[in-house]
Amino acid sequence: MKALFIHAKKFCFKPTKKALKSAEELSSKEEVCRENPLVIFLTVEKGDTEELLEKLLEDVRVQFQRVKPSGLVLYPYAHLSNELAPPGEARELLRRACERLGEEFEVVCAPFGWYKEFLLHAHGHPLAELSRRYP
């Protein structure tokens, strides 16, 4: 599992079309925008397990305290690895990550298996960008 954390002034995304046949149907393809979120670009890799979510949650808690965002955006992002988990496994781990994060934070979860356009306006402070790899 790999994550890229970006503290954004503004982040917007809009689903455009399915990237996977098995992608869930969406009730809306409207653009979603958040001001001052901590955006988590997350890649699920082969062999990743739910235990890794605990490590991710720990890092989210720490980063949340450091940068004081208004909430979180969890954004499935396959481009951080070339060792991707099968889509069904990735979708399930991302679902669990969204669920777990939602227990502690206000979170928006971008859809898995969709092409999405996005707008990212990042803060420029020293803690605005952070990458993590979870073994």
Where are these regions (language model features)?
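Active-site-proximal loop/turn and secondary-structure-junction residues that shape catalytic pockets
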Residues: 10-12, 78-80, 111-116
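Conserved mixed alpha/beta catalytic, RNA-binding, or beta-rich assembly cores of soluble enzyme
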Residues: 9-67
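Divalent-metal-activated hydrolytic enzyme cores
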Residues: 94-135
